[in-house]
Every structure is written in structure tokens, then in C-alpha cells.
């Protein structure tokens, strides 16, 4: 009887030890998971904040009223982010057109950029982009490039440069951002990117249709030729 009691006590202690080890392991795993979640959130926040910081060379707003954040612009320079500031700050000028092509420019190109922080919703950002396009006279140009930027807001200026040069400046371009993280970290924003671009294209198409109706019978073409371009996740 004593032997059985001792054996039972030892069995209970072993069982309790295993339970304790299991609980300890569970707590440790939960701690690791929680720690990794916090670390990931901190990393994403820091990455997004870095994308908001402007490069030293683009901290001063452009001097042209034909680009976003320039004189008279409705876009706050603080709302375009690093990539947006680069995009509007490197617009081709009439002098560039003359230097590269040898031809006289028709006009200085228009560039519109609206970043993620410029509005609380897709509709607000698209509405702001449309207001900028109207303000700058973008719908009076022969070409309008609609660009879907990458996850960071990066809008590739190279294809836009080409259109600006070939049209001798008689063009406009627009991009609306939907995030601040690299595309491989923005896969959860695919629907937002698609919704943003769809809303922008539909708004521009409606404006062009309206202008075409108003100019019908006037003997002139009342809308620009639309060109679409997407970068990475865009």
C-alpha cells in the first residue's frame, strides 16, 4: 500500500511537471508571436514614415504653377511624400523640350500628384486630383497620362518625360497614391490600388465626355488623348 502511494505521488509530480513545461512553452511561443507582431508593426511604421520624408533636393516646392505643390496648387507639399515630391519636382520644362528636340515648345508640361496623406479616402484623393487637373488646364492638352504608381507612391517619370518631349510639352500627367510601403509589403492593398485607379479613370473619362459634348459642333477637339501606365503593383 505504501509503495502504491509513493508511485501515485511520483506520477502526479511527473504529470504536473509536464503540464508546467507545456504551459511555459505556450507562454514562450505566445511571447515570441506577440514580439514579432510588434516588431513587424514598428518596421512598417518606420518604413512608411521614411517614405514621408522628402529628399533634401526636393524640400522646396516647385516654382511652376503647372505642377502640384507649386504656386496656386491645391495640394499641400506635406501630403505628397518623398516619391510625389520627386515626381513633381522633375517635370520637363519648355527649355528642356527645346534643348532635347531642337523644336519650340508648345507649353510647359503639367504634372499632378496626390499622395496617400492628402485625403482620408480614395474619393477625397481622386476629387483633389481632379481639382488639380482642372486648375492647371490639363484637359486642354493634347495628351493626358494616367499613371498608377507603385506601393510607395513611386511614379516613374521616364515614360512621362518621353511623352512630354514628343508632344513638345503639350501634355499633362496625373498619379494618385494609395500607400507608402514597397509593393512587396503592399499586397494587402491590391484592392485599394485597383479601386483608386478605377475611380480616377472613371472621373477623368466623365470629364472628357462632358468636354466633348460641350465642344461638339465647335470645330475643335475638346478632350485629350488618354494614355495609361502602371508601375509595379500599380
Specify the residue positions occupied by each region the protein language model found.
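Hydrophobic helices that insert into or interface with lipid environments
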Residues: 1-77
Amino acid at each position: 500500500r505504501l509503495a502504491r502511494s509513493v508511485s501515485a505521488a511520483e506520477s502526479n509530480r511527473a504529470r504536473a511537471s509536464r503540464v508546467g513545461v507545456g504551459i511555459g512553452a505556450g507562454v514562450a511561443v505566445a511571447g515570441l508571436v506577440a514580439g514579432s507582431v510588434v516588431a513587424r508593426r514598428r518596421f512598417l511604421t518606420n518604413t512608411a514614415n521614411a517614405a514621408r520624408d522628402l529628399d533634401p533636393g526636393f524640400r522646396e516646392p516647385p516654382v511652376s504653377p503647372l505642377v502640384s505643390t507649386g504656386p496656386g496648387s491645391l495640394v499641400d507639399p506635406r501630403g505628397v511624400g518623398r516619391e510625389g515630391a520627386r515626381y513633381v519636382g522633375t517635370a520637363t520644362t519648355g527649355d528642356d523640350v527645346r534643348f532635347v528636340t531642337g523644336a519650340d515648345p508648345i507649353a510647359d508640361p503639367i504634372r499632378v500628384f496626390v499622395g496617400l496623406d492628402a485625403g482620408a479616402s480614395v474619393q477625397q484623393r481622386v476629387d483633389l486630383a481632379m481639382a488639380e487637373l482642372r486648375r492647371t488646364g490639363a484637359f486642354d492638352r493634347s495628351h493626358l497620362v494616367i499613371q498608377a504608381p507603385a506601393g510607395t507612391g513611386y511614379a516613374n517619370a521616364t515614360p512621362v518625360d518621353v511623352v512630354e518631349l514628343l508632344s513638345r510639352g503639350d501634355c499633362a500627367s496625373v498619379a494618385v497614391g494609395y500607400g507608402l510601403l514597397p509593393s512587396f509589403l503592399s499586397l494587402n492593398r491590391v484592392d485599394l490600388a485597383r479601386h483608386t485607379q478605377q475611380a480616377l479613370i472613371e472621373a477623368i473619362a466623365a470629364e472628357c465626355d462632358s468636354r466633348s459634348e460641350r465642344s461638339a459642333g465647335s470645330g475643335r477637339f475638346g478632350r485629350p488623348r488618354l494614355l495609361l501606365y502602371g508601375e509595379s503593383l500599380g
